[in-house]
Amino acid sequence: AGFAGDDAPRAVFPSIVGRPRHTGVMVGMGQKDAYVGDEAQSKRGILTLKYPIEHGIVSNWDDMEKIWHHTFYNELRVAPEEHPVLLTEAPLNPKANREKMTQIMFETFNTPAMYVAIQAVLSLYASGRTTGIVLDSGDGVSHTVPIYEGYALPHAILRLDLAGRDLTDHLMKILTERGYSFTTTAEREIVRDVKEKLSYIALDYEQEIETAKTSSSVEKSYELPDGQVITIGAERFRCPEVLFQPSMIGMEAAGIHETTYNSIMKCDVDIRKDLYGNIVLSGGTTMFPGIADRMSKEITALAPSSMKIKVVAPPERKYSVWIGGSILASLSTFQQ
């Protein structure tokens, strides 16, 4: 969250709400019945953490309201009734989700005006393009959105309910095979950190597995909060491989490369060349080292042989949706 015209968000915190799982015994500690974001993160050892947003759709509106309240009053320190608000959502989200968002903004926070933008479109804005196909992958949902001369092509938008949280869950599971047990909601956050710091995408998965078997070159160690050190090897690339092979976690979906290709194929034959040459990655789950090369390799294999494929992975892509929103909201034409 932040202000239009800024080049980076002022506040970045996880969309989590934590509630104590023990009864408070010390009086006057100012204990709250719920903690949001970073504060929930720092006290996670005694809390049960819940995510109000699942697969890009808000499933718990009371908690979502807490998160917005925290954003306005504690993080940005603004009165929401004095500022128009730009919110974002995943494409193909249920209409009811958007209506409820709007209702809460106007009725609870009394915002003077609001707009709900599609995430992927904002990422393309941020990359300085008007034509391209965006693969946006966050915590709960991934989607591919082809955009031509500023128009999103709704019939060709594809959505994949596979994203960061599923990768974290998968890593929790494969670390169990190594004899490390992570089960609680707080431990899941530790595994998420392991994923973000150590995972990478193999250019050739089968070959990487062979390398991992024979040498210890892929092994890295990670220190847990209690000082215990764990070693992680092939898990580093087995975790995000799920993006390309969803069948690894029992999902019947196409991988991100195939979804991108399918999305391009749903577009008019005349504009495909422009899309192949402008594949833009966005969102935290596209931050894995090696993703652009692998994506390029996989799509080259699917596309016509003479086609020029270009995968763009901007360094700020973790926040490119926000940056695009900042650009959009500061345009004078938009404000009218």
UniProtKB/Swiss-Prot annotation:
Organism of this sequence: Solanum tuberosum
Family according to the record: Belongs to the actin family.
Database matches in InterPro entries: Actin, Actin/actin-like_CS, Actin_CS, ATPase_NBD
Taxonomic lineage: Eukaryota, Viridiplantae, Streptophyta, Embryophyta, Tracheophyta
Compartment(s) where it occurs, according to its Swiss-Prot or TrEMBL record: Cytoplasm, Cytoskeleton
Listed EC numbers: 3.6.4.-
Keyword Transmembrane: no
Signal peptide (UniProt feature, chain positions): none
Gene3D superfamilies named among the record's database cross-references: 3.30.420.40, Actin, Chain A, domain 4 (3.90.640.10)
Protein name: Actin-66
Catalytic activity entry: ATP + H2O = ADP + phosphate + H(+)
